[in-house]
Amino acid sequence: LASITASGFAVLYMDKLNALVGRYRGEAHEDEMVGYYPLCAFGENRVAASIDTALHAFLPFPHVDHLHPDWAIALAASANGRQKLDEFNKKYGRRIVWVPWQRPGFELALMLRKAVEATPGCDGIVLGGHGLFTWGGTQQDAYVTSIKTIDQMGEFVQDHEKRAGRPL
């Protein structure tokens, strides 16, 4: 990312991307959705949009971080990850939501949107077996939330290992 310029990013109209929800025919037709992304392109921009485009776009926040830090993966991939996330939230006063593993794509994007809508005030999402989403009103807010979350998850995992004598 240090060397990429604006021309290297896919730029899409949000209203067109959101309109694709009406075209979505369900999980069995997941793969066809990526074919619609070029129809949402802004101007002459023809940079291919990522399979994860909708994951970021459907979250109602100005800045979204999608991360795969080791500490979050330790939590997300543990056999009892949802339970451990509940413990984490209680310990740190957080409201991070668990979304079970789902293949990346449109269905997962809709699951994330629904999770946020169903949990007003949530401050992150752990994707089971996958990673972490955090956000903020500005780039700086998103960054600070991401670092804070990763640091807290690291502390949580290490504390658990010390207490239990084994990893999560």
Language model: regions and residue ranges:
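Glycine-rich flexible loops
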Residues: 1-168
